[in-house]
Each structure stands twice: as structure tokens, then as C-alpha cells.
Amino acid sequence: MDVLYSLAKTLKDARARIVEGTLYTNVADIVQQINQVINSINGSTFQTGGIGNLPVRNWTFDFGTLGTTLLNLDANYVENARTTIDYFIDFVDSVCIDEIVRESQRNGIAPQFDLLRQLSNAKYKRINYDNESEYIENWNLQNRRQRTGYLLHKPNILPYNNSFTLIRSQPAHDNVCGTIWLNNGSEIEIAGFDSECALNAPGNIQEFEHVVPMRRVLNNATVSLLPYAPRLTQRAVIPTADGLNTWLFNPIILRPNNVQVEFLLNGQVITNYQARYGTLAARNFDSIRISFQLVRPPNMTPAVAALFPQAAPFPNHATVGLTLKIESASCESVLSDANEPYLSIVTGLRQEYAIPVGPVFPAGMNWTELLNNYSVSREDNLQRIFTAASIRSMIIK
């Protein structure tokens, strides 16, 4: 994997810098690196493809080295160099694709494609190494079972979950109290509702709680908390728990009270915030507990009082909501996030070439299903194929 990254980095730089009219002295270093690549791989033959609909392709390397000149690079020089560079880029791209579409239940962090294993041969160690990539650095650490670390922007750590639970309900669902939530990616929306607007709750205060487990520990997270849940606080037709009927959710928005957000690690509270909105910070956690209250307004104008009558029927649902977003965090495990297209690259290639479902990943690389059972085997394989995807992304930009 190191050789593949170094190849890609060298080729990317060469493609960008070796252009017509450039002084040779300004690109002499990258020309020497390209020549080192050529000398290392010349005489080798490789084969890619042969899995799913990925076509078999044979690769033969017999290229002359790039020459030197005292003048600017002319069109002939650049055309000759580009022919070599483009062939090598196509080769690296094919190797990346082959690695991305393979998986293994055992030692999934190690290269699975025979060709990539061949590139670890001592013959290719002369290729100029450049291991500045975060993915390459972490791949090397994981390969040695040492601690890794990824800085993530809006990490996709929460499996999709949209549901509700009722604290109180009537058969006709004309007097209900409960919570409704939507968890996905890096966002949690939670709303508490009560047809009676806490009329019969102790002290006219209805309490709600929502606990969200993470699939991995997050560290040094920046989190935002806002006192509303826009996706949930709209009129909606909701199925009953048994799925045999539906009921009308008709929310009237109130502001939540006594909001408390606790970040826990192994069941212990690490960071706790009370009655605070905006930007929060959490040191490390593997679950989040959110508690809040719906307080019946002690004084109401006639228009408001008409919304929340003292007796049935109760046409509306007094509703309070919160939105929590994990804006950034570090994690020892590889995850997809808002900054990187690697999950899309991996999923797209597997669909394009009709790669059969293997022993590790769910069909279609379903992210929710993958997270719900994020095993060590899945993590190892995901780190390897995301590393290959990061290399491919670099050369096809």
C-alpha cells in the first residue's frame, strides 16, 4: 500500500508539473522520481481484473527514461512524458479498483489483491516514498495493531433510526405522550410530545429522556445543541406500534426546559451540560444521554388556552424538541464523513462492476447495516479499502 501511494503521489505531481514551456531545472526533481519509478518497474508484467464484471487487463512495462535538457520543455518532450505518466496512472487506478472490491474475514487490513502484495517486493522499495497521507499513516499503524486516529468532520457514526415510543396512549391515540426521534450520521433530533400539555403530570412538568449509543468512542468532539427539531415538529400521520392503524401527530411547539446533555464513557458521565445551547465540547464518549422537560405554561392567552384544553378532546400535541450535531471529532476507527467521498467511491465501484456480496460487507455497502454490526473484520477491511479509495481519489481528480 505504501508503494501504491508513493506511485500515485509521484505521478500526480508529475502530471501537474511537466507541462510545455516549463524550465527543465524547475522539474528536474520530479523527472528523476519518474525515472526511478520507470527503472524500478520496467521488466515487470501484471494482471488486473477478473472479479465480477471487472475486465482482465495485462500490463507490460518497458519504457525509456525521461531525458534532460538545458532548455524549456517542448511539446515532444511533454507528449512523451505524458504517454508514460498516463499509462502508469491507469495502472495505479486499476490496482486501486481491484483492491477496493476485495474483502477477507481474516486479516482484512492486509492487501487482498495479489498484485498489490507483489509490489511489496524489495525490487520496488527503490520507489520514492511519500507517506504523508493520513490514511497511509493510519493504515500502517493499524497493520501493526497500534493506535490510529482520524480527524472527522460530521462523522457518520449514527445508524439511521427514526422511531417513537409512547409513555401514555389511548386505543384511539387521541391522548398520547411520548418521544419521537431521528438519528442519522452525525445528527440527533429528539422531540417530546404530550396531548395534555403536562396537565396531569406532577407539577405540570412532563419529563423526557433519550439515550443514543455510539458505535465507536469519539474524542475531542465539537458539538452543537439547538432548542428545536425541525424535521420532527411537523404535522404527520404516524403508524401505530402494531402497524394496523395510523394516528395524527399535530405538534404545537414550546421551548424545552431543564435541558441536560451528558456524554458518557463506559456508563460513566465524562462531560455534562445543563441549560446550555450553542457550541459544546466533549472530551471522550461512547454514548449521549439527553434529558429535557415540557412545562405547561402557567399563564395563557385565550388563543393559547384553546390549543391546550383542560379536558378531552385534545386536538394538538404540545411538543418540545432538540437537535444535537457532532460537528467534528477524532476517532480511532475509520468512518465515512462529510469531507471525504470514499464511501461513495467504494459503493459506486462495487455496483458498477457487479461485485458479488462477500463475507464481510453487507449488500450494497449499506452503511446503517455496517455500523449496526461494526466488527473488527469490517473495520480492518474498511480501513484498507478506504486507503485504496483515497489513493484513487488523488490520481483521478
Swiss-Prot record:
Main location: virion
Protein name: Intermediate capsid protein VP6
The keyword DNA damage is assigned to this record: no
Keyword flag Ubl conjugation: yes
Secretion signal, residue range per the UniProt entry: none
Gene3D superfamilies referenced in this protein's UniProt entry, alphabetically: 2.60.120.170, Viral capsid alpha domain
GO molecular function terms listed in the Swiss-Prot or TrEMBL record: host cell surface receptor binding; metal ion binding; structural molecule activity
Record's subcellular location: Virion
GO biological process: fusion of virus membrane with host plasma membrane
Organism: Rotavirus A (strain RVA/Chicken/Ireland/Ch2/1979/G7P[X]) (RV-A)
Highest taxon of source: Viruses
